[in-house]
Amino acid sequence: MSKAIIKLDHIDITFHQKKRTIEAVKGVTVHINQGDIYGIVGYSGAGKSTLVRVINLLQTPTKGKITVDQDVIFENGEKRLSSQELRKKRHEIGMIFQHFNLMAQKTARQNVAFALRHSNLSAAQKESKVTELLELVGLTDRAENYPSQLSGGQKQRVAIARALANDPKILISDEATSALDPKTTKQILALLQDLNKKLGLTVVMITHEMQIVKDICNRVAVMQEGSLIEEGSVLDIFSNPREDLTKDFIKTATGIEEALIKIKQQEIVKNLPANAALVQLKYAGKTTDEPILNNLYKKYQVTANILYGNIEILEKTPVGEMIVILEGAATNIDQALNDLTHSDLTVTVLKRGV
């Protein structure tokens, strides 16, 4: 079992502005295991970026305890490392942002090399290291280009190479893909996944997009107004979200909301007959292998008309969603719904015929 490389325990962050007090983060506990790609999702102002900045003490918490790679760096309102020790610890944590923060007058190679300016490596070793990093992020042929000559995705690759220059154990991505188009976003996410596997890198993804969490993360925390409201594996959160905000986020990543809008406009749904029910089914794991709908007809003479279906793979587990119209005698439909509920499915009756 992987050990926690980041432990944030009971973190409070409070800002005082004139006569106003802002509780940006309230009592948040998050443990991130080594090798995780861990998503922290929330809308603007949720406190996610503020929380993550305490990992390397770019933001000092008001209360709480911070442990990074077994070292307690903050506890009981005090830093536990000397300035020199903290500087060394920060080298273990790379960061990338929405804005690439590249130096316009330096080439891609020079931008990456800048991160090694305090390194003990020789000039030749630094040169070799930069070449290796640019190759790692797929920019060997762009090494001598200036930022103005690079696309957004290429600039972010330079930023990633720079963030990896000091061989960090942790990479924090703070909305790093939000300025990129969908295709480039997928490419950057694929690169981060590759780096996670090749380097054993722990990646912390700050985002407001649940699609990114679904595509790359293995665990996720959901924040709202400074509080952590839900946390777990991506599979568990997508299969069985508890909080309304989490459910709203998941809808943006599955397409179910758009499907429901279109389905409810269909005549067959508008004029649903008395012997029918419009039902939404969510299922995961082994349930996807079972002929559930066929069994309903065999057992209850209830037919199923599939209006929408989608299956995705999360953490090597199939997760699916369907919207169906069940038709049959009212008592038989009730029995069928009860059967579905006891088959490890999440069943929501959207409409009954009248």
Curated annotation (Swiss-Prot):
Positions of ATP binding: G42, Y43, S44, G45, A46, G47, K48, S49
Chief localization: membrane
Protein name: Methionine import ATP-binding protein MetN
Subunit record text: The complex is composed of two ATP-binding proteins (MetN), two transmembrane proteins (MetI) and a solute-binding protein (MetQ).
Record-annotated ABC transporter domain positions: 8-250
Domain of life: Bacteria
Membrane topology: Peripheral membrane protein
Pfam families: ABC_tran, NIL
Keyword Chloroplast: no
Family from the record: Belongs to the ABC transporter superfamily. Methionine importer (TC 3.A.1.24) family.
EC number: 7.4.2.11
Localisation: Cell membrane
